[in-house]
Amino acid sequence: MAGRYDRNPFDEDDVNPFAGGSVPPASNSRMPPLPHEPGFYNDRGATVDIPLDSTKDMKKKEKELQAKEAELNKRESELRRREEAASRAGIVIEEKNWPPFFPIIHHDISNEIPIHLQRMQYLAFSSLLGLAACLFWNIIATTAAWIKGAGVMIWLLAIIYFISGVPGAYVLWYRPLYNAMRTESALKFGWFFLFYLIHILFCIWSAVAPPFPFKGKSLAGILPAIDVIGNNAIVGIFYFIGFGLFCLESLLSVVVIQQVYMYFRGSGKAAEMKREAARGAMRSAF
């Protein structure tokens, strides 16, 4: 009986399952190993070489930027100090904004002039531009006369009229009216009336253009136009156009001074100006 159980039933059989040849034997080749990856995180010994020259350049640029920043801060603080000193002294720093393509003056009727006075101010501004147009056309007319043999002197005088007339009108009567509208100053209104009357007289004189005290045909008025149209029709037409422009400027100026004077009287500025003039005379006397 014991002989039947001498063999262990759990022993592995010496049977090769691949001996039949249906399954090919495994190859002895191995898969190639993975390439070695650098230890970005664990390799603490890795170093990065930074050129010393680039480090020096960066430090130099940083110092230059800090110096420029300090200079800008210094200029800003100095500008702020000047603005504060000017505001304490009552000086208003105005930004130049007109004409838009080349700002040379500060001019902002819509934001600085009261609404009920803006129409009068725009009319006065049109009068200033009209004077500039008249004097510019006067240069064109005298240039044509000079080409036709009238002499260079009348052309030079026309240039002088334009160079002195337009800035003079702005300083003497337009800017005082602008400030008077802003501040309601009676004395500035009086300054405007004085020089605007001179402006009106000049426009009327230019429309007539007698030969005295101005030189010959240096103004494109009616008398020179009649004189030159017989010799040269084109020059005569230029002078007649100048006469028409000076007439329109004179009419517009009369309308402007009439409206400003009506407002001046109606708002009580006339009596205020008299009181201010009286106080000024008393201060001068004492």
From Swiss-Prot:
GO biological process, one term: protein transport
Topological domains annotated Cytoplasmic: 1-126, 258-286
Transmembrane domains' residue ranges: 127-147, 152-172, 189-209, 237-257
GO cellular component, one term: plasma membrane
Keyword RNA-binding: no
Residues in coiled coil: 52-89
Record-linked Pfam families: SCAMP
Bias-annotated ranges (Basic and acidic residues): 1-10, 54-63
Region annotated Disordered, chain positions: 1-63
Membrane association type: Multi-pass membrane protein
Main localisation: membrane
Keywords recorded for this protein, A-Z: Cell membrane, Coiled coil, Cytoplasmic vesicle, Membrane, Transmembrane, Transmembrane helix, Transport
Top-level taxon of the source organism: Eukaryota
Keyword Transport: yes
Localization annotation: Cell membrane; Cytoplasmic vesicle, Secretory vesicle membrane
Entry-linked PANTHER family: SECRETORY CARRIER-ASSOCIATED MEMBRANE PROTEIN 5, SECRETORY CARRIER-ASSOCIATED MEMBRANE PROTEIN SCAMP
Assigned protein family: Belongs to the SCAMP family.
Primary role: Probably involved in membrane trafficking.
Protein name per its UniProtKB record: Secretory carrier-associated membrane protein 2
Organism: Oryza sativa subsp. japonica (Rice)
Organism taxonomic ancestry: Eukaryota, Viridiplantae, Streptophyta, Embryophyta, Tracheophyta
